[in-house]
UniProtKB/Swiss-Prot annotation:
Keyword annotations: Cell inner membrane, Cell membrane, Electron transport, Flavoprotein, FMN, Heme, Iron, Membrane, Metal-binding, Transmembrane, Transmembrane helix, Transport
Location, primary (coarse class): membrane
Gene Ontology molecular functions: electron transfer activity; FMN binding; heme binding; metal ion binding; oxidoreductase activity, acting on diphenols and related substances as donors
Function (record text): Part of the MsrPQ system that repairs oxidized periplasmic proteins containing methionine sulfoxide residues (Met-O), using respiratory chain electrons. Thus protects these proteins from oxidative-stress damage caused by reactive species of oxygen and chlorine generated by the host defense mechanisms. MsrPQ is essential for the maintenance of envelope integrity under bleach stress, rescuing a wide series of structurally unrelated periplasmic proteins from methionine oxidation.
UniProt family annotation: Belongs to the MsrQ family.
Membrane topology: Multi-pass membrane protein
Cofactor: FMN; heme b
Subunit structure: Heterodimer of a catalytic subunit (MsrP) and a heme-binding subunit (MsrQ).
UniProt-recorded name of the protein: Protein-methionine-sulfoxide reductase heme-binding subunit MsrQ
Subcellular location field: Cell inner membrane
Source organism superkingdom: Bacteria
A GO biological-process term: protein repair
Database matches in InterPro entries: Fe3_Rdtase_TM_dom, MsrQ-like
Length: 199
């Protein structure tokens, strides 16, 4: 069955729910005290994992559309990408306010220098910021061929973000490795595309 624009609208509603309902759960968890003895760390990890999940979902859309021969699925990619940026911003805010504290926000610059995994995180967020800011049709027309070059930086984020997660975890957990493996698989699916860049 071929997807129609009506189907895509329904899928977008599902994306909104899948991306927004975890935020409501996060708020409820904070209010009800469902987190561990270190809720600040739990919130940071939760928002970070949501960012990674949405990043991987964004990267999954193109190969899924190609292999299932459903080209209209591409219309969902921008929405997932914007939610990825939104959760990435929540992740940055949670670290800045809960880990450092509002009174020590000026320490963020020093933290970026002394903790390399934070450097990878902020680079990833800045790229997502640029992609979100230029995700409109107007920006696409304005930038021309440069638009695609800029948005190819999402592949760099797909490398940096899992490393950021792996590096930041103090105790062993399989989750960072799972996300890293999924990122490698999704990048490997684009092997021919990357190979053509070097020709």
């Amino acid at each position: 069955m071929r997807l129609t624009p009506t189907h895509i609208k329904g899928i977008k509603v599902a994306i909104y729910l899948a991306a927004f309902l975890p935020f409501l759960w996060l708020v409820l968890s904070v209010d009800q005290g469902w987190f561990s003895a270190d809720p600040a760390k739990d919130i940071q990890h939760f928002t970070g994992r949501m960012t990674l999940k949405l990043l991987l979902a964004t990267l999954m859309i193109a190969p899924l559309a190609r292999y299932t021969r459903q080209p209209l699925l591409i219309r969902c990619r921008r929405l997932v990408g914007l939610w990825c940026f939104a959760w990435g911003t929540l992740h940055l805010i949670s670290y800045s306010t809960l880990e450092l504290g509002l009174s020590n926000i000026g320490l963020l610059g020093r933290e970026l220098v002394t903790r390399p995994y934070l450097t990878l995180g902020i680079i990833s967020w800045l790229i997502l910021l640029a992609l979100a800011a230029t995700s409109t049709l107007w920006a696409m027309r304005k930038l021309g061929a440069k638009w695609q070059t800029l948005h190819n930086l999402v592949y760099l984020v797909a490398i940096l973000a899992p490393i950021h997660y792996l590096w930041s975890v103090k105790t062993f957990s399989p989750q960072p490795f799972i996300y890293a493996l999924l990122a490698v698989v999704l990048l490997a699916l684009r092997y021919k595309k990357f190979r053509n860049w070097w020709r």
